[in-house]
Amino acid sequence: ACEEADVLIGASRMLKSVVKEGQQTFAAYKPEEITDYIFSHPQDENIVVVLSGDPGFYSGAKKLILTIRDRLKKSGEPDRVKTEILPGISTVSSLCAKLQIPWEDIKLVSIHGREENLLAAVKNNKYTFTLTGSAADVRKLAKTLIDARLGDCNMAVGAELTYEGEQILKGNVLEFLDYDGDNLAAVLIANPYGGENAVTHGMNDEEFIRGDVPMTK
C-alpha cells in the first residue's frame, strides 16, 4: 500500500521508515491536519496514512476515521472519500513475541485511564500490558505500582519495536523510577502474585528480570 501511494502522511518517524525515493509526503499526525490535507488535495487519489501500533488499540486511526466521517457528513458528499484500514504488526504482539510470552491471557489497559483500573488489572492478572506516551509515563507507572505495594512486580519496556533502534529493558519496577528512554514505549507488567487462578504459559518470573544487560534487538 505504501509503495503505491500518491502521498504518504504520518509522523516524521513513521514516514522515514516507509517512504521511497521521490515519493511525496506530508508530515502530520493530528486527525484534523490529516483530514484537511485529504479534502484539499482531491487530485491525490491514493493517500496512505501511516500510524504505529494496532489500529484497534488506542490508535490514532479511531479519531482519524471519525474526523473524516464528520467532514464527509458536513460536505454533503458521503462518497467523496473512501477509507480502508490495513493492520500491521501490533505493539502487544511484537513485544510479547520478543519476550516469548503468549498474550491470550494478558490484560490490556490504557495508562491514561483511571489509576484504580490500572492497579486493579495488575493486582488481578499475571500480566498487564499498556502503552505510554512519554518517558515520564513509565516513571510514573513504576512509582504508582510501588506506592500501591506492588513493588514485587517486574516490567518489560519496549521502545522502537520492529525498528533498527529497537530496545527492550527488563527489571523490577524500582529500576524504572529513573527511566529516560524513548517516549513512545510499550510496557508489560508481570505480577508474580496476580491472577493466581489464571493459566499463563511462557517465561518464568525470574526470566523476566533484566539481569546485567538490557534485552535488545
Model-derived features: where do they sit?
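Class I S-adenosyl-L-methionine
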Residues: 1-85, 93, 210
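Short, glycine-/small-residue-rich phosphate/pyrophosphate-handling segment
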Residues: 2, 91-124, 133
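Structural motif
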Residues: 10-13, 29, 52-54, 112, ...
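Short hydrophobic/aromatic-enriched beta-strand-loop microsegments
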Residues: 24-30, 76, 83-84, 103-110, ...
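A short acidic, often aromatic-flanked loop/helix-cap motif at beta-alpha or helix-coil junctions
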Residues: 31-36, 91, 114-116, 162-165, ...
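Short amphipathic alpha-helix with an adjacent loop that forms part of the alpha/beta core around
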Residues: 35-42, 117-123, 175-178
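A contiguous loop/helix-start segment that scaffolds small-molecule binding in enzyme catalytic cores
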Residues: 46-47, 125-216
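Active-site glycine-centered loops adjacent to acidic/histidine catalytic or metal-binding residues
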Residues: 88
